[in-house]
Structures are given as C-alpha cells and as structure tokens.
C-alpha cells in the first residue's frame, strides 16, 4: 500500500486523533451508512439532491478506484467523507471562476454522519482538504450544491467559499445548482 494512501493529515487546530485520509475498500460500508443516514434528513428538509439511488455504492467504488474518496476519522470512527477530484462538469465553463480548472480541484459528495453534525466536522474536513491541496500546489476549490441544499450552502459560506453563480447540470430547468469557489490564501512561500 502506498504511503500517500495511508498518510494522515493532523488538523492544524491540534486536535489529536482527527484526520483526513484516502478511503480504503474497507471504508465503503461506513461511507454507505453515512450516506443512508443523511438522505432522509435531506429529503425531510426539502433537499432532493441525494436519494436512495444516488450516490450509490458503484459511484463510491469508482471514487475509490480513482483515489478521490476521502474519509474524516476521529479515534478510529469515520464521521464524514468527501470526494476531491479534477472532474469539473462541462456546465462549469459558464461560471466566472477566478481560477482555471488546472489550478483548482472540485469538491463533490461530502457528508457528515448526523450523529456528529454540529461538532465542527464539516469545517475540519474542509480545512484538511485545503491543507492537502495547498501541499500539492493546488490554488483553490470549485464546488456546487443543489439550490435546495441550504445546509451545504451555509457550510461553504461559513468556510469562506465565494458564491459564483447558478448552473443547471441536468438539462432540467427545475433543477438548479449554486456554485462556490475558494481561492487559497497565498502565504508568499515558494
């Protein structure tokens, strides 16, 4: 197993035991448990971005195969997950991003187990993702979420992502998404 896959990135807040790492095949059951626990809450709040059928196990297996699925773990318990890749959907071309595709990565399919929501896990995950990307020379993140997904929009805004516009991903004019970008601060170190 390669070192990168097992590398743990300890939170800059100094909270020991919390880390973002690349997912392993053995994590897929827990990823699906989290997904299945958030879907009813999403639907209850009027957000139909995810469903029983999406994202499915095959989607996460593909993310795993592409080495883009990450889990956020604390004391051996996976509390959340996210996909970080360079898959910028074609409609992203219509958004006035500050950064190019080459200079950024896309954040997709992020969730936190409802049992741990409200404890800073989303913020911790986003900070760890940012640290990981900065370390790799990436300058920022592009992302989107359903117009209905107010909780995720709140998380993006709380974590200093800038609203960039609306887009339609599915050619369904009733299904709009909002886009966000975070450009990482340049610390002046080269």
Task: Identify the function of each model-found stretch.
Residues 19-33:
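A short beta-loop-alpha structural element at the N-terminal edge
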Residues 123, 135, 148-165, 173:
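Conserved active-site alpha-helix within GNAT-family acetyltransferase domains
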Residues 39-59:
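Conserved GNAT-fold acetyl-CoA-binding loop/helix
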Residues 112, 118-131, 154-158:
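Conserved acetyl-CoA-binding loop-helix of GNAT-fold acetyltransferases
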Residues 83-109, 117:
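Conserved acyl-donor/pantetheine-binding loop and adjacent beta-alpha core of acyl/acetyltransferases
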Residues 126, 133-145:
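Conserved GNAT acetyl-CoA-binding A-motif
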Residues 99-103, 158-159, 169-190:
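C-terminal "cap" of GNAT-fold acetyltransferases
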Residues 67-85:
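Conserved beta-hairpin
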């Amino acid at each position: 197993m390669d070192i990168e896959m097992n590398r743990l990135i300890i939170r800059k807040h100094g909270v020991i035991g919390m880390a973002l790492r690349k997912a392993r095949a053995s994590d897929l059951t827990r990823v699906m448990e989290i997904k299945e626990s958030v879907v009813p809450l999403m639907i209850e709040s009027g957000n139909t971005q995810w469903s029983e059928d999406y994202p499915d196990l095959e989607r996460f297996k593909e993310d795993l195969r592409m080495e883009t699925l990450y889990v956020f773990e604390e004391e051996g318990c996976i509390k959340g997950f996210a996909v970080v890749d360079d898959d910028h959907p074609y409609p992203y071309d219509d958004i006035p991003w500050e950064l190019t595709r080459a200079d950024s990565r896309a954040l997709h399919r992020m969730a936190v187990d409802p049992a741990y929501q409200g404890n800073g896990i989303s913020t911790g995950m986003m900070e760890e993702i940012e640290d990981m990307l900065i370390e790799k020379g990436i300058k920022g993140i592009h992302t989107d979420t359903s117009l209905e997904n107010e909780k995720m929009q709140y998380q993006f805004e709380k974590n200093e992502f800038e609203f960039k516009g609306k887009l339609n991903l599915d050619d369904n004019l009733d299904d709009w998404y909002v886009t966000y970008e975070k450009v990482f601060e340049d610390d002046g170190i080269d």
